[in-house]
Every structure is written in C-alpha cells, then in structure tokens.
Amino acid sequence: MNESKLTFNLELDENNVPKKIIMNSSDNQAKDVSLKSVMIAAWDETTKETLRVDLWTKDMMVNEMFIMYHQTLISMANTLSKSTGQDKLAGALRDYCEFFAQETKIIQSNQD
C-alpha cells in the first residue's frame, strides 16, 4: 500500500498566533511551501460532523482572505457538481460566489 504524509509546521508568536506556516509532503510534491493560511475540513464518520482547522498568519491581509474564501467556495461548487451531479445546487453556490466577489470588491461588477 502506498502512503503519503502531509505536514504543516507552525512557528507561533508569544500569543500562539501563527507567524509562519510551512507545508511539506512525504512524496515531495510540496517541499517547504510557505503559506499564509490553511483551511482543512474533514468528515468524522462516527459523529457525522465536519472537523475544521483554520489557521492564518498575522501578515495575511483581509483582501487575501477574501480571495482565498472566494476560490475555496468556487472549488466547493465544482466538487459538489462533480461528486454528486447536483448542478443546480452547484450553480446556486457559484451565484453566491459572484455576489461575494462583488461585495468584497475582488472582482468588478459587470454593471461598473
């Protein structure tokens, strides 16, 4: 059986806020990748709940967070469509992504 390990090393400040996040993988697909943020969601099959780890460094700007959220939501819509065939629900999520992007001003409105 093949195995691969993904690790995140954190350098914390005196208040335990991440100053640095470094990602590595045992298969060398990721080697010392410097991250400003990481969001991990995992499904606990026993409790039927999503477990979450959300970390970001002090130097991550709000606009960068908006872009990350937008890209994550788009990816979730694509995965929803691909994995379940629920294109209508995925489309609704994409519509929300458009609204989110306009409200956060990470993209220009077609009406501007």
Name what the model sees in each region:
Residues 1-8, 31:
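Structured beta-strand/loop patches that form or line metal/cofactor-binding pockets in enzymes
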Residues 3, 12, 108-112:
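Short hydrophobic/aromatic patches at helix-to-coil boundaries
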Residues 6-25:
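Active-site and channel-lining beta-strand-loop segments
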Residues 16, 60-67, 94-105:
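Short alpha-helical interface elements
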Residues 19-85:
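Active-site- and interface-proximal helix/loop "cap" or "latch" segments in soluble metabolic
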Residues 78-112:
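C-terminal charged interaction modules
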